[in-house]
């Protein structure tokens, strides 16, 4: 008797990577938007703050997407084959997410503390 796969196994790569990237992108945009008032407090105009915020968010998203996509193919293969995920793959996936989050924090810190002469 064939083993019934879970439904999410069929689109393993999409269900892991795309959804994760979209969630991280929204989180990054929200994070940057919350930092715009801080940037304005240091004497920058709203449009300047928004430009910096958009650039930081897009660069952060690009880095995050790279880390997530690099780590996730092995995860999606495991999903498609068995519908299960090993501890090592789960750890690798979490590490890639954390790396993306750290990149986002670093970009925002540089953006807030950098001098704009």
Task: Describe each region flagged by the PLM.
Residues 1-117:
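Membrane-interface helix-loop junctions and terminal tails of multi-pass membrane proteins
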């Amino acid at each position: 008797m064939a083993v019934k796969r879970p439904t999410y196994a069929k689109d393993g790569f999409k269900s892991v990577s795309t959804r994760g990237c979209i969630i991280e992108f929204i989180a990054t945009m929200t994070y940057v938007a919350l930092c715009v008032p801080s940037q304005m407090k240091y004497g920058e105009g709203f449009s300047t703050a928004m430009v910096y915020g958009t650039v930081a968010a897009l660069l952060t998203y690009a880095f995050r997407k790279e880390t997530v996509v690099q780590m996730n193919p092995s995860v999606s293969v495991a999903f498609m084959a068995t519908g299960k995920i090993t501890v090592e793959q789960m750890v690798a996936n979490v590490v890639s997410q954390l790396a993306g989050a750290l990149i986002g924090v670093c970009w925002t810190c540089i953006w807030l503390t950098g001098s704009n002469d």
